[in-house]
A protein has these predicted regions:
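Acidic, His/Gly-rich catalytic cores of divalent-metal-dependent hydrolytic chemistry
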Residues: 221-243
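A structural signal for well-ordered alpha-helical segments within the folded catalytic domains
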Residues: 78, 82-89, 102-105, 109, ...
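Elongated scaffolding segments in large macromolecular assemblies
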Residues: 162-222, 230
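Low-complexity, Ser/Thr/Pro/Gly-enriched N-terminal "stalk/linker" regions
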Residues: 24-79, 105-106, 110-127, 163, ...
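Bacterial N-terminal signal peptides
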Residues: 8-19
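N-terminal secretory signal peptides that target proteins for export/translocation
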Residues: 1-5
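Solvent-exposed loop and edge beta-strand segments that line ligand/cofactor-binding
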Residues: 65-84, 131-143, 188-211
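Well-ordered alpha-helical scaffold segments within catalytic/enzyme domains
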Residues: 82-97, 146-163, 209-222
Length: 243
């Protein structure tokens, strides 16, 4: 990830999402946000890693430079977009500005786009290439988690319209259902269709935290308690997740 984008994302997220005494009119914050938006948010509402030549359908099909899309402008679309959306929802809550709500809405549509370009149910693409649809075949858990993070924050806000909310809830339910049916593993596309890359039920410490978060987030969104019950969690923990 280029240092300039890393700095912009960390600056924006840190300053927007903490309790520091910062105001929207702070010039440095506004310049960072405006420049990040101008340079890295594409026409679909997906954040790119950097400004550069987009992969073509052939590049994506052949896995150039690799099937994961590493070192391409569309390597981390859901990761960056989901985190940025989480911050934009908070910014809109604080400011109440229509422009902030519009930008949050655009980012939510970007996440929806990432989950709508494949015929593999539950697949969330890393981004889209030059034709607005082509994508690399391998997603990952580090893309999937921020995808839920952003949409969770957005759908708990008052920003989406009733129609938009219905579409997004349906998509979240679809993706969550596929993950659950696959043992919370992340599906692949293209030449790797039927395989998985990453998941949320491993033995690492982060898997426990992210798995519990996904259960709570999806319940907040679709109110389906059966998903929590089927996880086999202790009764006390299951009840807390449904609070």
């Amino acid at each position: 990830m280029p240092c300039c984008l890393r700095r912009s994302i960390l600056l924006w997220l840190a300053l927007t999402m903490t309790g520091a005494s910062l105001r929207a009119e702070e010039p440095a914050i506004e310049r960072a946000h405006a420049e990040t938006w101008r340079r890295f948010i594409d026409e679909h509402g997906i954040m790119r890693d950097y400004v550069g030549e987009l992969p073509t359908p052939e590049d994506c099909r052949l896995g150039k430079p690799n099937a994961i899309g590493w070192w391409s402008p569309i390597e981390n679309g859901p990761m960056f977009t989901g985190m940025y959306l989480h911050a934009m929802v908070e910014r809109a809550r604080r400011s109440g500005a229509a422009a902030d709500k519009d930008q949050a809405r655009r980012l939510a549509q970007g996440l929806l786009k990432c989950a709508s370009v494949s015929d593999v149910p539950g697949f969330v693409a890393r981004g889209v290439g030059s034709d607005g649809k082509c994508h690399y075949p391998l997603s990952s858990d580090d893309q999937m988690h921020p995808w839920f993070l952003g949409l969770h924050a957005y759908l708990l806000s008052d920003i989406p319209s009733a129609d938009e909310r219905k579409v997004l809830v349906t998509k979240v339910r679809e993706v969550a259902g596929v993950l659950e049916s696959n043992g919370w593993r992340v599906p692949c596309d293209g030449a790797f269709k039927g395989d998985f890359r990453g998941g949320f039920k491993g033995e690492h410490f982060r898997d426990a935290a992210r798995y519990l978060y996904l259960l709570r987030a999806t319940y907040d969104i679709d109110r389906e308690a059966a998903r929590i019950r089927s996880a086999g969690l202790p009764d006390v923990l299951a009840e807390r997740l449904r609070l």
